Amino acid sequence: RRSWFIPSLARSLNDCMEDEYAFLLEAMENMRELRTKCTYLFLLDEPIVYHQNEKWICPQNLRLAAYYRNEEVDAFHFYDRQPVTDQKGICQLMSDDERHQFMIFLLFSGEKQYGLLACDIQQEEFPFFYVISLQIGLSLHYLEISKAEARRRQEMSRDLELVRERNRVLGFISKYDELTGLLNLRGFTEQTKKFCSSEINQRA
């Protein structure tokens, strides 16, 4: 069963590249299917790049993004995510008055770290869930690329509309005198051509 689970997880997450909220829910639904006792997914506001031999600095922008516990799956939009703070750490955000043995997996792709995954699983399951975490990290990388492409498309759409509006204004200015509103030479010539063309068509 587990031999085909990783490709299935990859496909299901890749189908959610247009919607981060759906992506998070799908990730937790997969944790439910794997029968973890509970799972918590924490994400950084922005991925952090760690280079080899650099001093590690504890991130200040880690937030609870989704969870699965007591057969309940939930996810949070960015501005609804609870941050990890000195007063309310990871353990407090995962507290449900039950005893747990969490295995913690860093979610990364290449040199970028995206967050961490906390799963209440048996120790012998660690290698398999490590591979799961690698796939989630890779899918988070694809999600980051997808969001960047969506932003670029929006910017290009705005720029194109701005160019069209400027062309409309320039076209109007080039046809009319700004002070009098009368047709200038170009505008008069174009209007005359249209008038002559319509006269010819009517005679035909």
Protein language model features and the residues they cover:
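Signal-transmission linkers at sensory-effector interfaces
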Residues: 1-18, 167-170
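Signal-transducing coiled-coil linker
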Residues: 2, 141, 148, 155, ...
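Short regulatory alpha-helical segment in sensory/regulatory domains of signaling proteins that mediates
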Residues: 10-18, 26-36, 196, 200
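Conserved nucleotide-binding and Mg2+-coordinating catalytic segments in signaling enzymes
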Residues: 11, 171-190
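The cytosolic transmitter module of two-component sensor histidine kinases
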Residues: 16-20, 24, 125, 129, ...
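GAF sensory domains
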Residues: 36-123
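Amphipathic alpha-helical "output/dimerization" segments
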Residues: 121-158
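Active-site-proximal structural segments of metal-dependent nucleotidyl cyclase/transferase enzymes
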Residues: 173, 189-204
